[in-house]
Amino acid sequence: MAATLTEAGTGPAATREFVEGWTLAQTLGEGAYGEVKLLINRQTGEAVAMKMVDLKKHPDAANSVRKEVCIQKMLQDKHILRFFGKRSQGSVEYIFLEYAAGGELFDRIEPDVGMPQHEAQRYFTQLLSGLNYLHQRGIAHRDLKPENLLLDEHDNVKISDFGMATMFRCKGKERLLDKRCGTLPYVAPEVLQKAYHAQPADLWSCGVILVTMLAGELPWDQPSTNCTEFTNWRDNDHWQLQTPWSKLDTLAISLLRKLLATSPGTRLTLEKTLDHKWCNMQFADNERSYDLVDSAAALEICSPKAKRQRLQSSAHLSNGLDDSISRNYCSQPMPTMRSDDDFNVRLGSGRSKEDGGDRQTLAQEARLSYSFSQPALLDDLLLATQMNQTQNASQNYFQRLVRRMTRFFVTTRWDDTIKRLVGTIERLGGYTCKFGDDGVVTVSTVDRNKLRLVFKAHIIEMDGKILVDCRLSKGCGLEFKRRFIKIKNALEDIVLKGPTTWPIAIATNSVP
């Protein structure tokens, strides 16, 4: 019998069964080639994230799926999102991964503000720990950014999205990479210019991530001569007076000057980065890298002019660039395969030279076993081919909602919530709304660099209350958070306030 998804219950909170005993609770993310679903085992309560890619609809995704699975089979580390297995059903590929209940790292970054230094330090050192594991095994990630760093239920970093990863070292022999890939604000300058070493390029991305965590904004749109902010940094030309640098203290700056050295040969290694004083300083819980009240740069930091080009992905790439440079950002956990139109600029006419060596190497290196700590009854997911009817499992919905700050409960009924939400967004101007029968409002707009920004608002009825759950679909994560705050503030009169139940507090990330 062909695999199909059977629905149980009715209305926006209906759940469906994937295989017997495993219920589809919600959509976690989506991309050009498929969706990521949350699966819950009704017997054990365990949760798994499942990527679905239909290769009949997207035949160009086949190589990306194969490569991602090959690499993730090799990885078993506490700061790497765990791979549980893969299953094929007809033309559809199902990839089963660890469920990161803490959400995306970008959701913890307050736009234009960042986060306290002790939090940034913790996330940063965990990122470096996971990256060290990858590099020791000869694997480069090549698309590190806050949207690809997930958090588990204990707030530990999990590196995800290995669609652009590759092996740069095998049997002790290291090779240069020549494929230009990644997300423009985070890629190292040498990636846009020539063949490059893998490790310094990944470390550059870590440096940009640290800037966004400390300052709540990106330092530049792209590391090229076309970007004034970057050339000022490169040429040591009055960059100290500009944001985000004017927000950071001298200790953080001393680390970033070495980590974001434009010459990969003088850039800090991973080991020296971890040895830097900033990574070992004991920060107070509420200490930020700057003080908005006392800083002489406060007015500049908060001015519209200073923010105008922050947190935006780059303008269009020049026609000389290769494929796989992403201009947009993906919400957690997005499928790693991306299309030309939605996520990457595919300008190269042929395959990169480095692709040829990956297939055999990965096949030789990949282990056949699944990752450690895999859920009980996982074989049901990997082997079952027949779908069965299920009972409604909405009682587990609260507990399994990924923690996200971009959601809120309202006091209105389901129908009234839809009307208020759509009406409010349209009155704000500059948005296009489309409402689907599944209770999802798709909101489209453009950011300040005229790049597409799409997010979805799911209107979910649960436990007698209505949840407005917003998530990014395409575009910059922090720009999405800015728009969300404006919309939520405009709906303030219907936002649920006051004491809430424990499950509601967990779902909305508002645990006292």
Curated annotation (Swiss-Prot):
Biological process (GO), any one: regulation of cell cycle
PANTHER family found in the cross-reference section: MAP/MICROTUBULE AFFINITY-REGULATING KINASE, SERINE_THREONINE-PROTEIN KINASE CHK1
Family, per entry: Belongs to the protein kinase superfamily. CAMK Ser/Thr protein kinase family. NIM1 subfamily.
Subcellular location: Nucleus
One Gene Ontology term of the molecular function aspect: histone H3T11 kinase activity
Impact upon substituting P189L: Impaired cell cycle arrest in response to the DNA synthesis inhibitor hydroxyurea (HU)
Stretch list, region Disordered: 335-360
Top-level taxonomy: Eukaryota, Metazoa, Ecdysozoa, Arthropoda, Hexapoda
Classification via InterPro entries: Chk1_catalytic_dom (IPR034670), Kinase-like_dom_sf (IPR011009), Prot_kinase_dom (IPR000719), Protein_kinase_ATP_BS (IPR017441), Ser/Thr_kinase_AS (IPR008271)
Residues annotated for ATP binding in this entry: L28, G29, E30, G31, A32, Y33, G34, E35, V36, K51
SUPFAM superfamilies per record: Protein kinase-like (PK-like) (SSF56112)
Name by which UniProt lists this protein: Serine/threonine-protein kinase grp
Known catalytic reactions: L-seryl-[protein] + ATP = O-phospho-L-seryl-[protein] + ADP + H(+); L-threonyl-[protein] + ATP = O-phospho-L-threonyl-[protein] + ADP + H(+)
Gene from which the chain derives: grp
